[in-house]
């Protein structure tokens, strides 16, 4: 039987998913092969129910199996990622949103932390995963560097109990490694760490799970993205052209045919500088409205503009995110960002789905 299954897989390996150089077997789209007595049946897994290539791929599979292996009957069950069972830990998670940046140093983790707090203050149930494996900063920003998550048994399976601070459930690799030691891991190790935190955490009911991704679009970054189910992605940038150029790469990655994750919009961080002694003044030290212009060009939302103010730095250093003070100017900026993100997720109509990275 194994030899027959291998023959079928070898033939189906000749079927390329349209628009990519990868076969449907390499993309793990072929499952549950059964064959015998002139009949073969298997399951084809597609990302979306409205995939325009469903018919063409099925037709090609049927033709090749009849031509090369002589099957008279080919039965193909078509299923979509939305229909597949979620991992136990994510069964009650409504939306998973990636917070990303094409470039380091643009304040992505600061935005992710304060967005999580703002969503929690708006009444949502929120979780935050620090997937920046090589530079985890969430424990510091939430003032819980000394926290030690423990294991709990849920449904006969051991899961990690997240740390809870300011109404946000938190998991970070920073809780499990020496803060003074460099994390020198290859891609698979980093991917496994993320998967363990996301699918091995006891998240229970969440309206939003935010994933603070590493900066960039490297192979490790793409591997991390494909291990989780995403409702959408947020791209953080400063107004500078050097940062915007990398933001474009991030947008293109999420919108590429092999990933197809909705980009909810852009966040312009460090939009302007306002000194404490001159609260009405705005100094555009990194340029003006760069992210707004990029959002317009790409047909995306500008989800928020976050200024540079001293309290953001102080909040990050002290473990007290500025979004906790929702009546302050900067707190209001993050509350507006939270409202816009919630609206954008609702408008996409996308529930969490897995992605497969192709080249």
Located regions from the model:
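C-terminal boundary of histidine-terminating zinc-finger modules
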Residues: 318-328
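Short, basic phosphate-binding NTP loop
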Residues: 68, 73-95
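Switch II (G3) loop of P-loop NTPases
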Residues: 150-152, 173-188, 195-223
